[in-house]
């Protein structure tokens, strides 16, 4: 299980990303429309003004149950060992164990 502080930090980053999402998107559109280089530099300065943790690349996908940051399956939102345990216990609909 991940530490509670790391999970809270990730939630804080998600809130910041949602808050500044429109500002980042509009600044990127402005950069593509403006022809002069000096204006692009000014808009680029605006793009750097939001907090660093509001960037979408700072977000990390975590396991829904344990908070584990690695080996996550997007379809289920679970880490590998939790997914395996749930499938073996028949708690995930549509997931079957492989047999050949």
From Swiss-Prot:
Secretion signal span: none
Domain of life: Eukaryota
UniProt keywords, alphabetically: Chloroplast, Plastid, Ribonucleoprotein, Ribosomal protein, RNA-binding, rRNA-binding
Pfam families given in the database record: Ribosomal_S14
Subcellular location: Plastid, Chloroplast
One Gene Ontology cellular component annotation held by this UniProt entry: small ribosomal subunit
Homology family: Belongs to the universal ribosomal protein uS14 family.
Protein name: Small ribosomal subunit protein uS14c
Source lineage: Eukaryota, Viridiplantae, Streptophyta, Embryophyta, Tracheophyta
Gene that this polypeptide is encoded by: rps14
């Amino acid at each position: 299980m991940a530490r509670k502080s790391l999970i809270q930090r990730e939630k804080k980053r998600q809130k910041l990303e949602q808050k500044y999402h429109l500002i980042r998107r509009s600044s990127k559109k402005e950069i593509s429309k403006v022809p002069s280089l000096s204006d692009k530099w000014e808009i680029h300065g605006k793009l750097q003004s939001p907090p660093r943790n509001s960037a979408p690349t700072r977000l990390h996908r975590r396991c829904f149950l344990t908070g584990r940051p690695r080996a996550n399956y997007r379809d289920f939102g679970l880490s590998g060992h939790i997914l395996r345990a749930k499938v073996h216990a028949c708690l995930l609909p549509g997931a079957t164990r492989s047999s050949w």
